Amino acid sequence: MTVSFVHLRLHTEFSLVDGLVRVKPLAKAVAGLGMPAVAVTDQSNMCSLVKFYKTAMGAGIKPICGADIWLASREEDGPLSRLSLLAMNAKGYRNLTELISRGWSEGQRNGEIIIERDWVKEAAEGLIALSAAKEGEIGHALLDGEEAKAEALLREWMEVFPERFYVEVQRTSRVNDEEHLHAAVALASRCNAPLVATNDVRFIKQEDFEAHETRVCIGEGRTLDDPRRPRTYSDQQYLKSPAEMAELFSDLPEALENTVEIAKRCNIEVQLGKYFLPDFPTPNGMGIDDYLRHASFEGLEERLEVLLPKDTPDYEAKRQVYVDRLNFELDIIIQMGFPGYFLIVMDFIKWAKNNGVPVGPGRGSGAGSLVAYVLKITDLDPLAYDLLFERFLNPERISMPDFDVDFCMEGRDRVIDYVADAYGRNAVSQIITFGTMAAKAVVRDVARVQGKSYGLADRLSKMIPFEVGMTLDKAYEQEEMLRDFLKSDEEAAEIWEMALKLEGITRGTGKHAGGVVIAPTKLTDFSPIACDEEGGGLVTQFDKDDVEAAGLVKFDFLGLRTLTIIKWAMEIINREQAKKGLEPVNIDFIPLDDKPTYSLLQKAETTAVFQLESRGMKELIKKLKPDCLEDLIALVALFRPGPLQSGMVDDFINRKHGRAELSYPHPDYQYAGLEPVLKPTYGIILYQEQVMQIAQVMAGYTLGGADMLRRAMGKKKPEEMAKQRGGFIEGCKNNGIDADLAGNIFDLVEKFAGYGFNKSHSAAYGLVSYQTAWLKTHFPAPFMAAVLTADMQNTDKVVTLIEECRHMKLRIVAPDVNNSEFRFTVDDDGRIVYGLGAIKGVGEGPVEAITECRAEGGPFNTLFDFCDRVDLKRINKRTLEALIRAGALDRLGPHYHDELKAYQATVDLNRAVLLAAMEEAIQAAEQTARSHDSGHMDLFGGVFAEPEADVYANHRKVKELTLKERLKGEKDTLGLYLTGHPIDEYEGEVRRFARQRIVELKPARDTQTVAGLIVNLRVMKNKKGDKMGFVTLDDRSGRIEASLFSEAFAAAQSLLQTDALVVVEGEVSQDDFSGGLRLRAKRVMSLEEARTGLAESLRMKLHADLLKGDRLRWLGELFNRHRGSCPITLDYTSADAKALLQFGESWRVDPADDLIQALRDQFGRDNVFLNYR
C-alpha cells in the first residue's frame, strides 16, 4: 500500500511550553507507523534541528526541517498570526536560519519572537509555507467572515511563495476547526491553491494529552482546573497513523497526498562532523604552520631562560629533550590541521594576561602539551611532571583539541568581549543550554498545577534524596519511606504518576558556563542564534554537542573564583609591599618547596585552600602528610569514590610512609622498567597517563595507541578487552617479557584504569591549591580578606571563614562607614576590616554612595551628618537600619570612645540611640535637601550648622539594647556574632553547673558537663538505619564535637538546632585522628532545663521602695505566668528592717530567660540572679 500521509506540523519539547514530543521516541514512532518522513516545526526556534536530523537519519526517516513563526500584524495592535515554514533545499535552510535569528535579534516584543512580513518576503527562496490553518492570518480572516480579505492575503502569499504556498486544514476537535476547513477549502478552490492536511502534533500518544496540558500549565503558571485558562489543545493532537489521517480526511484525499509531495520536495543535507576554524592573522604574510613553529620556539627560549639556566649541568642534552618534544608536538598539530586553534587560544590568553585578567595555569588534558606551555596557554612544565601530549591530542584518534581555560571571574567577560571585537561580533557567541524538569522540581510543579497542597508537595519532594543525577525511579528504588507514602496516599501517587511522564522534559534555556564559539564567517552560516530582548547575551540555538557537530569549534572560557581570590589577595599584598618599598610578589614565581606551606598542609589547616577544604579531604591530608607538589597532585586524584573505596588510598599512604613495601606495580608481579613511571605515586597506578606509559614501556605501544587502550579499558567491553589483552601480551613478548607477568600486570592496569585520573588536570589544579596554601601561610590576612570577599553573599560560608580567622589569631575589625570598603580589606595594623558588602540588605549601590561621599568630604561625624551627606535615594531606611544593627555606624554615635573597653561598655546604648534617632536624622536630611533646592531656610538647620550641638539630645534617655538584642542585630545583618557571644550573658551562671570551659576540658572517664552554643549539626544514619548526630559546641573559649548515638539523639532531637544554647553531659576522650578532644554525649539539656534541675532558687535583692504602687501586683501576675518548680527567695531591705524571705511552694516558677529578663528590666540586672547548689 502506498503511504498517503506525512506529518508536517509538529512541536517537540524544544517548543518551550507547548510541545511534549521527545526526538528519539519520535523517530521510532514514525518508523513504526511506516511513514518515510516527518517534519519538526518548533515555535520560533530550531534548537532541536541537529538532534532531530541525526536521529531521523539514523532511523531511516527523512527529516524535514522547519519552524512555526509568529507573524507581525498588519494593524498596529492587531493579533499575531502563525505561519509554518519548511526548508526545501540548502538555500531554504540558510534563509530559515537567518529569519529565525533575525526574529530573536530584532523582533522580540512582550516575550514573543515576532517576524515582520517583509523579512519573510526577503527570505522566501527555498522555503515552502503552510498557512497555519485557523491560527494563520488567512484563517483569522475566514473565521471573521472576511472572505475578500482572506482571498487577497492568499494571493499575496502565493506570489511570495510561487507554487510553494499551501492552504492548511486541520481536524483536531478544537473550536472552529470545521468552520475554518470548509471556508478554506472553498477559498483554495477559488484561488487554485493546493490544500494540505496537518494534525498540529504536540505529543506522540493520545494518552499523553493530560501530561501535555500539565506541561503547558507549568509553563504558564496556571492550575489545570483554572476556569479562565484557555483550552488551546485537544487530545487529538497526537502522532496519528496514515490510516487514521486517511479516515479523517477521506473527503479531501488531495490534502493528504500533498503532504507526501511536500516531503518529496524537501531535500536538505545538514553538513555535520566537519570543523571550520576562523583564520588567524599572521605577521608578514607568514604561513600559519610556519608562524606556529616560530612562536613556539620563541616561547621555548623564554621558558628555558627560567627553567634551565645555561650553567645547568648537561644543559645541551636537557635542552634537546625540550626541542625534540616540541618538534614532535608541532608535527602532529600541523599534520592534524590545528595550528589556527592553538594560535587563537594563545592570542586571547595573551590579551587577558596583558590586560590584568588572571588566567589559570591549565585545566584538563591541555596541560600536557609543551606547545601550550611555550605559547603561555598553560603555566605548568609538562616534562617536569610526566604529562603526556597524546592524552590531549591523539593522532590515532582524530578529534578537535579542547582547551578549557580558567579566567578570573571579574575579567572573563572582558576576554569574551575582546574575542568578539577581534573576530567579529556576528561571528562570536556563547552557547545555549537547556534546563530540564528534574526530580524534586517536577514533583513540586505537578502538585502546584494539580491544585494539591503545598505541604503535600513539600513532603513528597523532601523524600527524594538531594543528589546529583537523582531521578524519580532511583528515588523510588532507594527510599522505603517514599514507597510506603505513595502506596498509602492517593494524591501523592497522582502527583508521582504525572511527574514520571514529565521528568527530563526541556523546561527552559540558559547559557553554557564557559562555552564560546568563534565562526570563520557569520554565526548564522552554522547555527541559528538567540539573544535577550535588548539584542545582547547572544547564544547559539544549538547546544554544545550540536554546535560542534555543525562545524563550530568550542572554546571554554571558564570563570574560576579562586583566580579572583588570588588576584584580590595580590592587590592587597602588593599595595602593602609598595608602602614598605619592597618588590611586588609574583604568584607565578613562588617557591614550590616551601616548608612552612607544607607544614600548614600537613596540619590540614586547609579551610579556604582551593580543593582541600572539605572535611573528608582534611582527613585524607592528615593521613597522607604531603611534602611535595607531586603529593598535592596525587591528593586530588585520590580523593574520589573509586580510589577511596578500592583500598588504593590506604595502600598509597602506607607506601609513602614506609609501612608497606614499594613495588612496581605489585609485590607478586613486578617489572623494574616501570619504576620511573610509577615512582612519583609510590608504585600505585593512579593516573591515566601512567596507564598509557605502562603500555608504551612494556608492550611497545605508541602513546597514541596507548591512549586508545586507556579509552577501551574505561568502556569495559569484554570482547574489546580480550582483544586488547592479547595485543598487550604479544607486545610484551616482543620485548622479552614473560606472558604470565604481562597478563597479571595487564589485569592490574585494567582494574585501576577505571579509577585513573587525568594527571594533567590534577597537576594544574594542584598548583593552584599550592598557591592558595602559600598565600594563607605567608600573607594570611590579605588572603582571608580576599576569600571573605569572594564568599560575602554566602552567609554560612562567611561564618565559617570568620571562625577560621579567629582560629588563625587574625584580628577582625567590625564594619565601619568611615573605614570599610565594599570588599573586606586589611588595614595598616594587619587587621581584616569587615566589608560593607557583607551586610545583608546593603548592596553595591549604597556602598558606592557611602565611599563616594567619604572620598569627597572626609569621615562622617554623626548619624545626622551621614544622612545629610549621602544620597538617601540610594540608601533607604531599611539599609540604614541594617548598617546600625551591624555596628557600621557605631563610631557616629554619642557614646563612642577610642578605648575599646569604653566602647564595649557603651555599645548597647550607642546602637539604641542611633536606632531611636534614625527617623529624625532622615527627616532632617530630607528637609535640608528640600530647603536647599527651593532656596528657603531650613528648620533643621541647627542640627547640621553647629558643630558643638548635641544632635542626640532627644534620644539619650532611650533604653539601651540588651546583649541579646545587640547580638541578634549582628546575626540578622552579618550572619554571625561579632562583638560578643550569646553565652556571655550566662557566663557566670553556666559556670555553676558547667564548671569548665571547653578549652579547659581534659580526657577522663567521669561524666563532665559542658555548656555551649550549637554552631554546626550533622545528622546521619548508622548501619541499622537509626539516626545519630554530631554537634559542634562553642563557648567562645573553644569548640568541641559531641557525638549523640541513636538513643541520646532521639531524646535530644527537639533541642538540636543551630544557635541553641545547650548543656551537655558526657565523656571526654582524645581523638587520635584529629589530635583534639571529642565528647560522647549521654544527655543534652536546654538552659532552662539545666536551671530547673540544678538551681537552688531564684533570688532577688529588693528595697521596699521598689515594691510600691502596682509593682507587687505586676510581680504576682508575672510569677503566675511562669509557674514551675524553682523556689523564690527575696533579700528584702527597708529603712528599718532587713530579712531573707522564702516564698511559699505555690509561688515556685520556671526560671526561663524571659522571666529573668523581665525582672532585671524592672529591678536592675544585679538584683536578680539564680542560686545554684
From Swiss-Prot:
It catalyses: DNA(n) + a 2'-deoxyribonucleoside 5'-triphosphate = DNA(n+1) + diphosphate. InterPro entries: DNA_pol3_alpha_NTPase_dom (IPR011708), DNA_pol3_alpha_thumb_dom (IPR041931), DNA_pol3_finger (IPR040982), DNA_pol_IIIA_C (IPR048472), DnaE2/DnaE/PolC (IPR004805), DNAPol_HHH (IPR029460), NA-bd_OB-fold (IPR012340), NA-bd_OB_tRNA (IPR004365). Coiled coil: none annotated. One of its GO terms (cellular component) is cytoplasm. Keywords: Cytoplasm, DNA replication, DNA-directed DNA polymerase, Nucleotidyltransferase, Transferase. It is found in: Cytoplasm. SUPFAM superfamilies: PHP domain-like. It holds the Pfam family DNA_pol3_alpha. One of its GO terms (biological process) is DNA replication. GO terms for molecular function: 3'-5' exonuclease activity; DNA-directed DNA polymerase activity; nucleic acid binding. Its EC number is 2.7.7.7. Its main location: cytoplasm. DNA polymerase III contains a core (composed of alpha, epsilon and theta chains) that associates with a tau subunit. This core dimerizes to form the PolIII' complex. PolIII' associates with the gamma complex (composed of gamma, delta, delta', psi and chi chains) and with the beta chain to form the complete DNA polymerase III complex. Belongs to the DNA polymerase type-C family. DnaE subfamily. DNA polymerase III is a complex, multichain enzyme responsible for most of the replicative synthesis in bacteria. This DNA polymerase also exhibits 3' to 5' exonuclease activity. The alpha chain is the DNA polymerase. PANTHER family: DNA POLYMERASE III SUBUNIT ALPHA. This is DNA polymerase III subunit alpha. It comes from Pseudomonas aeruginosa (strain ATCC 15692 / DSM 22644 / CIP 104116 / JCM 14847 / LMG 12228 / 1C / PRS 101 / PAO1).
